[in-house]
Amino acid sequence: MNSTTKHLLHCTLLITVIVTFEVFSGGIKIDENSFTLVDPWTEYGQLATVLLYLLRFLTLLTLPQVLFNFCGLVFYNAFPEKVVLKGSPLLAPFICIRVVTRGDFPDLVKTNVLRNMNTCLDTGLENFLIEVVTDKAVNLSQHRRIREIVVPKEYKTRTGALFKSRALQYCLEDNVNVLNDSDWIVHLDEETLLTENSVRGIINFVLDGKHPFGQGLITYANENVVNWLTTLADSFRVSDDMGKLRLQFKLFHKPLFSWKGSYVVTQVSAERSVSFDNGIDGSVAEDCFFAMRAFSQGYTFNFIEGEMYEKSPFTLLDFLQQRKRWLQGILLVVHSKMIPFKHKLLLGISVYSWVTMPLSTSNIIFAALYPIPCPNLVDFVCAFIAAINIYMYVFGVIKSFSLYRFGLFRFLACVLGAVCTIPVNVVIENVAVIWGLVGKKHKFYVVQKDVRVLETV
């Protein structure tokens, strides 16, 4: 089955899910039973009715990102063929693969550095270096393609940047940086694994050279799955990459909704110009702050073909902590005076749809207990939003799990399992919102990343 056929089947399934959900939820009115005949003003009272309508309209905050996901998943081939090199890897500019770590998992770092180096060599890439930037020495073996940078404890940036921002800024200092302005940096987390497909995509991106920033797809169900619940929940993020992220970069070439912190490709001159020295507020979600600053300075972005591999958090607590940090960090970005309002408008709408999630999800209960009549368009849009969000989990599994590897029965079980994780994920996201709003904002929680640590405990 070729990629075009797969994409058409995916689009058919998506439309089927939308139409089915619209009909059964009342988004599309097919008979008189689809209409709500209650007069809420007399039935529930004025205050209760106003609150019910406010809760219903809060759902619409997610509409911009839902539309981006829908368009990205439909208008671009969701199952592209293997990436084909558009030029010789020998002609590619110098590439530095930069891994930032605290140094808590040295064995993991050593293993992944070796794997990633071999992946680059297998792809034919010759002009590259792997840099590991760490707070604590991991004692990497000496190799001409590997450089270990230990950030001194006494190092401070001009604005007092912390955590990952501080480490990344240290690498850009004149007495540390060994790269030319025309070189490129591929930013990875310590658990991120390159694939030959992603290396070819990066080579094509840097050979093209039209955009100084780029990012691609990360999947989470590769090799051994540690926690099935968090992995299935993260299938949503896979769809988010293939939908919203891909559309904003391929069509607009702007990080309208920000980007991720790994699989980040930057040109050195642009990265140094934007800088990671963005104070405390820019240190919790440093990737988001960096993208918004680059956006406000007029830099352009593009989507990079080819996927990389990561693992989902190993425990539900880590999953919760991860989401809490993202929420807190993005809120700091949205509220920062350093980012012009027009550049963070869509990001602000997106994060406030997340902040109000405990209120908007209460519609599930209140809509059943206290139905209210709404304009047909509102009912249609609300059902459309719900259908797309459900399908995001389904598509994420289809994209992440191999039918040949798992077999039809286990593959369908994974799809069903992803749908079943939605209530759990909603609960976790709601807890993360509440905890994020009342908890300490300037904290950087690092999740467990080394499987071998779990195996020996």
Swiss-Prot record:
GO terms for biological process: axon guidance; border follicle cell migration; cell fate commitment; follicle cell of egg chamber development; follicle cell of egg chamber-cell adhesion; germ cell development; germarium-derived egg chamber formation; glycosphingolipid biosynthetic process. It comes from the Eukaryota. This is Beta-1,4-mannosyltransferase egh. GO terms for molecular function: beta-1,4-mannosyltransferase activity. It is an enzyme of class 2 (transferase). It is a multi-pass membrane protein. Keywords: Developmental protein, Glycosyltransferase, Membrane, Transferase, Transmembrane, Transmembrane helix. Pfam families: Glyco_trans_2_3 (PF13632). Its EC number is 2.4.1.-. GO terms for cellular component: cytoplasm; membrane. It comes from Drosophila melanogaster. Glycosyltransferase with a proposed role in glycosphingolipid biosynthesis. Neurogenic protein implicated in epithelial development. Critical component of a differential oocyte-follicle cell adhesive system. It is found in: Membrane. The keyword Membrane applies. The gene is egh. Belongs to the glycosyltransferase 2 family. The chain crosses the membrane at residues 8-28, 35-55, 57-77, 346-366, 378-398, 415-435. The keyword Zinc does not apply. The lineage of its organism: Eukaryota, Metazoa, Ecdysozoa, Arthropoda, Hexapoda. InterPro entries: B_mannosylTrfase_Bre-3/Egh, Glyco_trans_2-like, Nucleotide-diphossugar_trans. Its main location: membrane.
